[in-house]
Amino acid sequence: MARIGDGGDLLKCSFCGKSQKQVKKLIAGPGVYICDECIDLCNEIIEEELSESSELKWDELPKPREIYEFLDSYVVGQETAKKTLSVAVYNHYKRVQAGGSSGDGSKGEVELAKSNILLLGPTGCGKTLLAQTLARMLNVPFAIADATALTEAGYVGEDVENILLKLIQAADYDVKKAETGIIYIDEVDKIARKSENPSITRDVSGEGVQQALLKILEGTTASVPPQGGRKHPHQEFIQIDTTNVLFIVGGAFAGLDRIIESRIGKKSLGFRAVLHGKDDPDGSDVFGDIMPEDLLKYGMIPEFIGRLPVITSVSNLDREALIRILTEPKNALVRQYKRLFELDSVDLDFTSDALEAIADQAILRGTGARGLRAIMEEVLLSVMYDIPSRKDVARVVVTREVVLEHVNPTLVPRDVVSKRAPRQEKSA
């Protein structure tokens, strides 16, 4: 088919027609041949198609109201934070859609700057969940990094470039896709310097990390080691542009409320002073009055604060909010545990006062919504241990006494349930 001459020694590519002398390599198949040039061309076509399919469809960019409604189905409360994030994320990806500039050449192009987000508030109130839910809705790569593990370059610990590696890995090493992703840096309050005054000694895990993060937050082409770890002079690097990467920076910022109160004069002394308890929900509402100077006093450097123009906060969760978290969201804990018991053909029910007791325990422990799962595990441990081995139990009922007094939940046998069923049919 592709043989030339009687000797059959001269072959040519079945696709482009070039002879084996005109190309570097000719690969044989069953009755066909393909050259290295055609293979390279096929690879380019496949890569282009994959990159086009992996890109975010900007025509379908959700509006702020749609983003808010999606967040509302997963996150209970925190209306101000959800509204702020919805607007900030929409504006960010609208900027990416516009290519970072607006206007025509005659009037001069207007560059749209990036607006990273600072999300502060007590632990267990939904900061991480908000960021995760945003990434899920937009279908963009998402990575979570812990600021406490980061150190300045040259010291023991993780380099800031490892944050970008996590994003690249989340995008299956598709760098172009990773360049429009979201990075959530948690525990950023732990890299605050010890005082607002510059330190004489080198602060490699505090101020040094803040300085190392500056260029990445602002937008730069960073060199990332493909296997992580420290940089070596002879290894290859992945180049990633962080200009269109949205950074959401979160932290509990314990003690920041006192700095804000002292500035706005809310703190009072004397016999008639209004005292707020440690777990008073009003304590976190003061974050709504935050100013950059408060973060400066806390230990964040001015350059770092300046790269986080959007500041929003989450508030402490009260009993009503915690009960809603247990029952309302799509992935509510009560629904999750009911599903676990359904897999063993057992119904699980919680009385209303049991849910109130679980919420009260979470408030007492000061762990917020994150502590609800630990309490549920403690309450259901004995039942989850016995139920898989028993076939006579049809229903488990958890009451307030089970939560507070650690008694065993009520087990309803299958024969009782089956006897009740015909009676209900007769009455109906």
Curated annotation (Swiss-Prot):
Domain ClpX-type ZB: 1-54
Gene Ontology CC annotation, any one: HslUV protease complex
Keyword Plastid part of the UniProt annotation: no
Source taxon at top rank: Bacteria
Keyword Magnesium: no
Entries under InterPro entries matching the protein: AAA+_ATPase, ATP-dep_Clp_protease_ClpX, ATPase_AAA_core, Clp_ATPase_C, Clp_protease_ATP-bd_su_ClpX, ClpX_bact, P-loop_NTPase, Znf_CppX_C4
Alphabetical list of SMART domains matching this protein: AAA (SM00382), ClpB_D2-small (SM01086), zf-C4_ClpX (SM00994)
Binding site for Zn(2+): 13, 16, 35, 38
Pfam families on file: AAA_2, ClpB_D2-small, zf-C4_ClpX
Entry keyword set: ATP-binding, Chaperone, Metal-binding, Nucleotide-binding, Zinc
SUPFAM superfamilies, A to Z: Glucocorticoid receptor-like (DNA-binding domain) (SSF57716), P-loop containing nucleoside triphosphate hydrolases (SSF52540)
Role summary: ATP-dependent specificity component of the Clp protease. It directs the protease to specific substrates. Can perform chaperone functions in the absence of ClpP.
Family: Belongs to the ClpX chaperone family.
Quaternary context: Component of the ClpX-ClpP complex. Forms a hexameric ring that, in the presence of ATP, binds to fourteen ClpP subunits assembled into a disk-like structure with a central cavity, resembling the structure of eukaryotic proteasomes.
The protein's name: ATP-dependent Clp protease ATP-binding subunit ClpX
Gene: clpX
